[in-house]
Amino acid sequence: MISLKNVSKWYGQFQVLTDCSTEVKKGEVVVVCGPSGSGKSTLIKTVNGLEPVQQGTIEVNGTQVNSKKTDLAKLRSHVGMVFQHFELFPHLSIVENLTLAQVKVLKRDKTAAREKGLKLLERVGLAAHANKYPAQLSGGQQQRVAIARALCMDPVAMLFDEPTSALDPEMINEVLDVMVELAQEGMTMMVVTHEMGFARKVANRVIFMDEGKIVEDLPKDEFFDNPQSERARDFLAKILH
């Protein structure tokens, strides 16, 4: 489903990713964690071409992401992305936020797109807010809208880049609950997060990054019970204290 082979990336002279390789199979949930500046967000953004790379190959569902021939807009319509900040259009209502890309990118009929949007708002517990504007919703609600918007495109996989890090603590669980449901329904997911409770609950594997390298790529239980590197042990000791 998702394959990264020997991926390296530089910003000028500074190397942000070094020889990163991993695979995410269909239906797998892989959590990517590590200290700030370790390259986690950059790695996940390479998967749908938001961050170009200078070396290596990236494939999603058989499409080579970093090929000049690839239609990235088409690829991104199949790979949902949820960011740290919700990236909703402030001048559009919630349901309009959910229908816009369906109509413009997937060429769906407006009525069908609206129906799909309302159905997914119901799924994330926000059907009553369909005609409100983003500023009228809490951060947790806006992030749930962002997840619903990505799901409207019928993605084959979902990428999450620290989806709860901009939220107040009491709003984190309402977003994680939606993500847990998605995982349990079999959605293929790559998730950059510090929420280790979420990782323990639904991850199949955990990738630990440091200084632009994948240091560990282990089954969840093995990572938490017996991390191989001192750097990962130190990270877990601090985050699970």
Residue spans for each PLM region:
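ABC family nucleotide-binding domain
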Residues: M1-K220
